[in-house]
């Protein structure tokens, strides 16, 4: 299923959006119902639709366009569940809070960091670790290359203030990426 054309995950993100809309339409009697509580809609959305939308995304070398495609689809679904049109001028963040749903950007980032932690703690002889450092033979084309998965992870780690060494301690790593934003000082007391 994960067939990337020349290192791009564009077709994969399009497929995920299409599958998520299919699942959303399947669940629309509940998700679009006026009588159902927003909290219930949010829980059903997270389990049935958002999980389909971001399936496997922790392994994608995600470009900005791919992320925007996922975010755009999710925002449309969130507005539909809340019964709010764009003309109402309600902030999407407020709608996320009322549903109890985290944005797809944060979920993808956390899942990618969680996967990185698993890979980083693996034995260096494991095939997963070996795949990270494969050198492809051939001539490199001119210009900047495509964004790699490692670059995506590096961005995520910079935004959370993390280092590669932090991934070795599973408890600290899990608490850092779970939403409990630990500062460097509070991490020091754990070690």
Predicted segment positions?
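Short linear motifs embedded in intrinsically disordered, charge-biased segments
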Residues: 1-191
